[in-house]
Amino acid sequence: MGKPTLLEPGHLYNVPAEHKNDVPIHYIITWIKQRLPEFGGAIPTSLADRVLIIKSRTGSGKSTALPVHVFRILRNENTHSFQKYLGRSVICTQPRVLTAVTLAKDIGASTHYPDMILGQTVGYQTKPLTEKPNRGLIYATAGVLLAQLHTMTDDEIASRYAFMIIDEAHERALGIDLMLMYIKSMLERMLQRGSIGALRIPFVILTSATIDTHKYSTYFGIGKENIILVEGRQYGVETHWPLYNTNNYIKTACETALTIHKENIHDRPTEADILIFMPGMAEIRFLSMLLNNANMDLAKEKLPLMLILPIDSEAIAQENEAYLGLKAEIKNLWVKNPLTAKVEKPLRRVIVSTVVAETGLTIETLKYVIDPGWNRSIETYYPEWAGGLITRPAAQSRIEQRKGRVGRVFPGHFYPLYTKHVFEQIPAQQYPEIITEGPGAIFLSIVVETIKKNKEGVFKAEEIDMLDPPPTDALASAIERAIVAGLLTRGEKGLQLTQLGDIASRFSFLSIEEARMCFSGYFWQAAISDIATILAVVSVADKKLTNLLDSKQRNGAMLAEAVLAGIPPFLQNIDNAYTNIHLLLADDLLEGLFIFEGFQHAIVYFINNKVNNVAKHLREWCEKKMLKYSSMVQILARREDILNELAIVGLNPFHQWQNRLASANAETFLKRVCTLKQCMYEAYRLNCFCYDEHRLLYTGRNGIHFSYHDAVIKNPSCIVTPRIMLSPVSKQYMEWRLEPSFVSVLDGFVNVDINFLLPRQEIPNILGGAEDEEEEPPLPIQVFLHKYVKTHFHFSGKSFKELKMKPGQTIKFPETTLINMIPDIPKNVVQTYLEISVCHQYSFKRLIYCETFYTDMDDVQHENSVELIGLPMAAHHLTINDFNKLYHLLKPDGFLMVYDLHQSQEAFWLHSLQDALGHHTIRRDMDFHTIPEWETIFKECGFTPIFSKQPSEHELFIVFKK
């Protein structure tokens, strides 16, 4: 293998004329040393003294030679290996796990770098994989450095790293853009501290083959002298442009690979491999099938065979057979002859990969690249907040990266499946994810970093300092979501983080909705482990629960055995178990919770029985349940990450562990179901949808609508979903339809704010500072409290009339009241939380479980409604049979009365009951502690009791019919 061009003289550009023939790496190292005080350089005073951009063509050694030589600035290469390095490290970030791991291992095994020993002076750190020294050259995914910048102080980062090399800096993932924002802010803060902070400022190097040097240099405020251009490829790459485009790129890719194989049958195995890029795993599977069929034809013709290796992020994480085949030498690989079933040596490997092989990966035997020219990424559309995986033409910069996989060790060939004319029409650079996806999970981090620079401590959109700020509609949507979640509030001078928002901003990777759902879990006394599991299922299963199935033909019925493996014991022996569970829960997310519980039961069982090779037995268990083992492991890891995040910010991740849904009995099951649904509702309330009986569609507050059908649950009135997905209508046309990802039915479980679901009105000046707002007109009597009730408050027996409240009025209380109540909320506190609406008029088809409910029912028409009074603590004691009986008893003229006898509130409930019944002879000296006493009062008012239950001497549950 020849030397990288960084180590060969005469490849420098954009440097003084006298240095054009220098060895690039020597020039770069000298340039850096001239700016380091320990080598005689001046103390840095600006970003120009600490930021360098290197644009270096693929194959130049920017991912291998550059980090090693930078590390040698800190540690002489002739230092004996037994001498432990104790200085600061060099971190080199990579956009993907594969490249981070591969580069570290390759350098550790290379004879060119004898001083670089894996685990001693060089290593890697990714989320799933780590093998690194405490100090040295560390290859890491961008997410690792991002998390450190998020959680560590400037001094802690400076004490850990002397150099930060951001490789493939042209990639515009959300995390990379945020990481650059963090780095720039950190450098500016340390420079502002003068010489004390400047002496240890880390040196930042941005490298890429296709970086927009003007854009990045402008962002960091540096000049042309901070940009070094290096020519890359040592060998030529021939591009074979087709005459026509293809309308079936998978089939054409297979035909092209087969043609290459047959026409180059005399290739040496060490210079023969083919790499084919595909946009997703579905295409990889289909193409792999076609190539394996082609192997059958080759066997019939008695020609050498191909070894097909499908590679994606999952293959890398598991280090499966295909990944091991990629890393092995070709001479050690075998392929089975499909005719004789005998193994033989393959002529070449055909690697079918997603974009994980696009950057930073060197396959020394690679000679051919086939590129269909497509890229698949998430796109989100605002204000509807609907998104999905969209397949579009790849940008020219990405195509150059793909082309750059060959021509490193010997001449290569590039086969695009599109014409040169098409290539010239597509965008030069990829769109940043912050444009295509919006700020997403990094929004609160953007807010915090922007507030740090604001003298008044408020968030102003125009002050966001990123390579590209979020689009206005995406930013407005993110602000709205944060306000609704109680994480952001409008102060006198602008938008500010609430105390909940401050806690949420400390999470490394939880979105606004995920953070809110965790907080709601503490408010409502839910088992936080259940909350974490639900969020992990949403993250891994992505669109639908059936994505957890390891089967090509996926449907909900196939989930039955997996769901039943995790349900509570008291439900396991009922008839038509899965159908009844599906009907009872009416919730995809809770079914996902039970699927994971079953997997967890299996883990505990195998460990307790001390079986050998637990992983093998778990795989077999998943196969029996038709589940993807890899997906279940990912849920386990994601769940652990969420629980760790909670612990890091000081919250108890095992809060209410004893109240997990899987451990419920007949008396507590429905209460826990309601609690979890309440948490989902509070987290995703912007994604609540009501059924329109006229249009036969579900509609939401943003005006979007979609159809939803369930074989068992017929047209529920109100549902909530974590996200609205764009799903392709057909494979032939670029058309999509809207559909919910997971569905949680709220009917009969949660008190939904109907007014909140009305079509939203434009929010004036949502991106600017606070303005004087006109007083809102009173809302209809059915909404007694405004939909933005801010926090807990002690009721102390006063009625709302005594508090001089009006319909539609907003109540504001110090949010410290809320924070101080986490996680143990006193029972005598009226449980009205952030953003919880209070209303009382609902369709009779719904049995509402709510934690707080107040009404003032003077002059209210009771048409098709069930009226509620009081706190439904007793409702939590209803069994499943009670629930079913009650559900069928309710009629349009029914009257549901739920009562909790807290002494401090008794006077108020009597007052409210008196107003509601229009009956002014209720004796205040009565001791309303028994069902008969309450029945007497209601009979006097013309009501007949039809159902009653008294779980304890202090709790009553009665249904009356007019």
From Swiss-Prot:
Gene Ontology molecular function terms on file: ATP binding; ATP hydrolysis activity; RNA binding; RNA helicase activity
This protein's UniProt keywords: ATP-binding, Helicase, Host membrane, Hydrolase, Late protein, Membrane, Nucleotide-binding, Transmembrane, Transmembrane helix, Virion
User: Which segments constitute the Helicase C-terminal domain?
Assistant: 253-459
Q: What name does the UniProt record give this protein? A: Putative RNA Helicase B962L
Q: Which family does the similarity line name?
A: Belongs to the DEAD box helicase family. DEAH subfamily.
Family matches, as Pfam families: DEAD
| Any GO CC annotation of this UniProt entry | membrane
User: What does the UniProt entry say about where the protein is found?
Assistant: Host membrane; Virion
Task: Kindly indicate whether the keyword Cell membrane belongs to this entry.
Answer: no
What residue stretches are annotated with the Helicase ATP-binding domain?
43-229
> Can you tell me where the transmembrane regions are?
521-541
- Nucleotidyltransferase: is it a keyword of this entry? no
Q: What is its main location?
A: host cell
Question: Which residues bind ATP per the record?
Answer: S56, R57, T58, G59, S60, G61, K62, S63
EC no.?
3.6.4.13
Q: Which organism is the protein's source?
A: African swine fever virus (isolate Tick/South Africa/Pretoriuskop Pr4/1996)
Q: Which Gene3D superfamilies match?
A: P-loop containing nucleotide triphosphate hydrolases (3.40.50.300), Vaccinia Virus protein VP39 (3.40.50.150)
Q: How does it sit in the membrane?
A: Single-pass membrane protein
Please write the reaction equations for the catalytic activity of this protein.
ATP + H2O = ADP + phosphate + H(+)
Q: Where is this motif: DEAH box?
A: 167-170
Question: What induces or represses this gene?
Answer: Expressed in the late phase of the viral replicative cycle.
CDD domains, sorted:
DEXHc_RHA-like (cd17917)
